[in-house]
Swiss-Prot record:
PANTHER family: ALPHA AMYLASE DOMAIN-CONTAINING PROTEIN, GRANULE-BOUND STARCH SYNTHASE 1, CHLOROPLASTIC/AMYLOPLASTIC. GO terms for molecular function: alpha-1,4-glucan glucosyltransferase (ADP-glucose donor) activity; alpha-1,4-glucan glucosyltransferase (UDP-glucose donor) activity. Synthesizes alpha-1,4-glucan chains using ADP-glucose. It comes from Natranaerobius thermophilus (strain ATCC BAA-1301 / DSM 18059 / JW/NM-WN-LF). It comes from the Bacteria. It catalyses: [(1->4)-alpha-D-glucosyl](n) + ADP-alpha-D-glucose = [(1->4)-alpha-D-glucosyl](n+1) + ADP + H(+). The keyword Cell membrane does not apply. ADP-alpha-D-glucose binds at K15. Its EC number is 2.4.1.21. Belongs to the glycosyltransferase 1 family. Bacterial/plant glycogen synthase subfamily. It is an enzyme of class 2 (transferase). This is Glycogen synthase. The keyword Glycosyltransferase applies. Keywords: Glycogen biosynthesis, Glycosyltransferase, Transferase.
Length: 496
């Protein structure tokens, strides 16, 4: 079996968020556990680190037509951890300082989607399955049906679309379908059963309709996006395609995120860390010193490492933070960037309170230090497709405090439940500041009960969020899709 994974990001080449983490690790895990010939294609951004780019192997140049345009592009390859990565290089679209945020994103990623299909003869690689990720590559599915399905080597291909965050759908003006892809079918642009989305068109919706299967990054999120509350306007479509919708929990790279070997942290350690030296505690004391927090082993240190946006629960946090700092003996460290009013407010509180450090930036090395140093990790998201922060925190022995939503619900088992069982964290249900406040205070209370707390830490060490289980589920889905009757695909029956 041959699989081509298409993505806008893949670590360590290009990463701006969780998408890059997933696509840098999942294909490697699949390769390790199967005989599948899995390869990855992504844009050849100029921002790719030079230590990789200097080792790229040129394959050839190719002209990619995009409507009336003819873009000369170069295709290169690089073998990373036994997986071939292809890079589509184009000076006009990808020679930019950043990956996202440009006015011509429809054209930029429309080009990438078209190029994915056009370079296959050059590579002499025709996959059985193209595994697409988010809106940046979702147009491959309708393009395959309308422009390539009649061609030899393309007519048996299947597509899977993974939704990493339904909020981002690639919404553009309808004319782009004709302008970039020569798709003149009126219903594609104007029929709500197709790509039309409130007078615009949605690249992601094209993938949701025409892909043979849809996955998302946790079982709970797969259910949530079929509801009006979290379906982002396509809940009806997702409900209709529920038999083709799979929730597969993301993992993290245990080779990369490993407190025993992480070169970024102050002192490497094993969990549970109960010895006389208590290496994890040394990380805490060193971080407090570096961030100019009062140095204390007794005071619980709560970390927040995320984007400073409403989705991540900043409205709840900023509402209760002054009360917590006044009423509890606790320290907070924030690391991230986002909406200016959150950045400014946290900076203001940090000047006012000695027990709060606001690091308004993103620094991977500092993030690792904070994971290793913190006692608790706060993630009270409004919605959360999967979440990587709580998984990394658990790996480093930081006890999560989360809202029970999406992947947070699937990964954090409460330490106190109605049955009295002890799990790995603290959870709350409603998106409510006072409910979160109560849960944080409860966690602080249990932090000081050392025997109970040590039991939670011991429980953390039994959790495995490595990619092996997720990879097995994707392998199973690939095989299921390959053996599905090509002449009766679900996408066709849905549109009739």
């Amino acid at each position: 079996m041959k699989v081509l994974v298409a993505t806008a990001e893949a670590s360590p080449f290009a990463k701006r968020g969780g998408l890059g983490d997933v696509l840098g690790a999942l294909p490697i895990a699949i390769k390790k556990q199967s005989e599948i010939d899995i390869r990855v294609v992504l844009p050849g951004y100029s921002a790719i680190p030079s230590q990789f780019k200097s080792e790229f192997q040129p394959i050839d140049s190719i002209i990619i037509p995009l409507g009336w345009r003819a873009q000369k592009s170069r295709v290169s390859s690089y073998n990373f951890r036994n997986v071939t990565f292809y890079f589509i290089e184009n000076d006009y679209y990808f020679n930019r300082e950043d990956i996202y945020g440009y006015f011509d994103e429809a054209e930029q990623f429309g080009f990438f989607s078209k190029a994915i299909l056009d370079i296959m003869p050059l590579l002499d690689f025709y996959p059985d399955i193209i595994h697409l990720n988010d809106w940046h590559t979702a147009m491959v599915s309708p393009l395959l049906k309308y422009k390539y399905a009649h061609k030899t080597n393309y007519n048996q291909m299947k597509t899977i679309l993974t939704i990493h965050n339904l909020k981002y759908q690639g919404i553009f003006t309808p004319h782009v379908l004709e302008d970039f892809f020569d798709l003149h079918d009126h219903k594609l642009q104007h029929d709500p059963e197709y790509l039309e989305y409130h007078g615009q068109i949605s690249f992601l919706k094209g993938g949701l309709i025409f892909s043979d299967a849809i996955t998302t990054v946790s079982p709970t999120y797969a259910k949530e996006i079929q509801s009006p509350e979290l379906g982002m306007g396509v809940d009806g479509l997702l409900h209709k395609r529920r038999d083709d919708l799979y929730g597969i929990l993301n993992g993290i790279d245990y080779q990369d995120y490993n407190p025993k070997t992480d070169v970024n942290i102050y002192r490497n350690y094993n969990l549970p860390d109960e010895g006389k030296t208590n290496e994890k505690l040394i990380n805490k004391l060193r971080l407090q010193e570096d961030l100019r927090l009062p140095v204390s082993s007794r005071v619980p240190l709560i970390a927040f490492i995320n984007r400073l946006v409403k989705q991540k629960g900043l409205d709840l946090i900023t509402y209760v933070l002054p009360e917590l700092l006044e009423s509890e003996e606790v320290q907070f460290v924030f690391l991230g960037t986002g909406d200016p009013h959150y950045e400014q407010y946290l900076s203001y509180l940090a000047e006012k309170h000695q027990n709060l450090s606001a690091q308004i930036k993103f620094d991977e090395g500092l993030a690792r230090k904070i994971y290793a140093a913190s006692d608790l990790f706060l993630m009270p998201s409004l919605f959360e497709p999967c979440g990587i922060g709580q998984q990394i925190a658990i790996r480093y022995g930081s006890v999560p405090i989360v809202r029970k939503v999406g992947g947070l619900h699937d990964t954090v088992y409460p330490s106190i439940s109605e049955e009295g069982t002890r799990g790995i964290g603290f959870t709350f249900e409603s998106f409510n500041a006072h409910e979160m406040l109560f849960t944080i205070k409860e966690a602080i209370q249990y932090y000081h009960q050392k025997a109970f707390w040590q039991e939670i830490i011991n429980n953390l060490t039994t959790i495995d969020f490595s990619w092996e289980k997720s990879a097995c589920e994707y392998i199973e889905l690939y095989h299921k899709l390959i053996h599905r009757n090509t002449n009766s695909t679900r996408k066709e029956s849905y549109l009739k």
